[in-house]
């Protein structure tokens, strides 16, 4: 019965193809038309420049940079060839470098020759306890004063520094710094005289390290210090230990 009932409907659909479309197909087509197309994130290869053009652009930039450098070098060379003062400065600089190399080579050769012909011995200078105490105290004082000078110069860069710290440091450091005022002209409003003050203070510190060294006596009779005596004794013992295995092997 159901098959016979559906036969007229099927015949009507075949005979009338332009009949009404079912609701399922209408909703499906409307869903496709309303859904927006998703664009891909891949770049468009047609908009990108070809690789050959990029390489050519980089090569052209490199060539232009090299040519500009060569032109600038030629300009400097021509300017230097026309300026006798610059030529004299270059000549003096080259001669100074040659002289420094010769002095360094001569000192190296001399040290090697001395070390090869003579035995090296390190002796602590000084044999007086009082001299060592005075020298160490002076060295410590100069090092502390150097640190105070550094702190004083650093605080000059901070205008809002507390006066309770700045005033004592100014009382200690300004008399020494004022000695060197005016020796070096200021450069762009910057006072460079403290550089000379630090150089002199470092020279004093280096000189203080050599104060406990002993000087030879005027009559010519030199009595060895206790450190020298200990070193000679140690050297004799080491040489005796070195010769002992050789004598045992000969027996």
UniProtKB/Swiss-Prot annotation:
Residue stretches spanning the membrane: 119-139, 183-203
Keyword Transit peptide: yes
Membrane-related topology note: Multi-pass membrane protein
Annotated stretches, region: Disordered: 232-251
Transit peptide, from-to: 1-51
Superkingdom of origin organism: Eukaryota
Effect of deleting the gene: No visible phenotype under normal growth conditions.
Keyword Plastid assigned: yes
Keyword tags: Chloroplast, Membrane, Plastid, Thylakoid, Transit peptide, Transmembrane, Transmembrane helix
GO cellular component: chloroplast thylakoid membrane
Cell compartment(s), UniProt: Plastid, Chloroplast thylakoid membrane
Main localization (coarse): plastid
A Pfam match: YGGT
Comp. bias intervals (Basic residues): 232-243
Sequence similarity: Belongs to the YggT family.
Primary role: Not required for the biogenesis and accumulation of native cytochrome b6 in the thylakoid membrane. Not functionally involved in the pathway for covalent binding of the c-type heme to cytochrome b6.
Name of the molecule in the record: YlmG homolog protein 2, chloroplastic
């Amino acid at each position: 019965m159901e098959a016979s009932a559906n036969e007229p409907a099927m015949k009507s659909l075949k005979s009338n193809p332009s009949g009404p479309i079912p609701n399922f197909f209408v909703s499906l087509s409307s869903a496709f038309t309303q859904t927006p197309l998703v664009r891909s994130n891949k770049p468009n290869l047609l908009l990108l420049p070809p690789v050959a053009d990029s390489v050519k652009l980089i090569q052209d930039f490199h060539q232009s940079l090299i040519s500009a450098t060569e032109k600038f070098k030629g300009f400097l060379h021509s300017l230097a060839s026309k300026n006798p003062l610059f030529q004299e400065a270059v000549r003096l600089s080259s001669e100074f470098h040659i002289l420094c190399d010769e002095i360094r080579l001569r000192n190296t050769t001399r040290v090697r020759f001395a070390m090869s012909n003579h035995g090296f011995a390190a002796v602590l200078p000084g044999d007086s306890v009082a001299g060592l105490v005075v020298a160490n105290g002076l060295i410590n004082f100069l090092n502390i004063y150097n640190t105070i000078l550094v702190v004083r110069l650093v605080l000059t860069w901070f205008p809002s520094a507390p006066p309770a710290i700045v005033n004592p440091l100014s009382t200690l450091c300004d008399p020494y710094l004022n000695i060197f005022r005016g020796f070096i002209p200021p450069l762009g409003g910057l006072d460079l005289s403290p550089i000379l003050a630090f150089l002199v203070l470092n020279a004093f510190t280096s000189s203080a390290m050599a104060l406990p060294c002993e000087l030879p006596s005027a009559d010519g009779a030199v009595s060895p210090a206790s450190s020298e005596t200990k070193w000679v004794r140690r050297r004799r013992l080491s040489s005796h230990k070195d010769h002992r295995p050789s004598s045992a092997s000969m027996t």
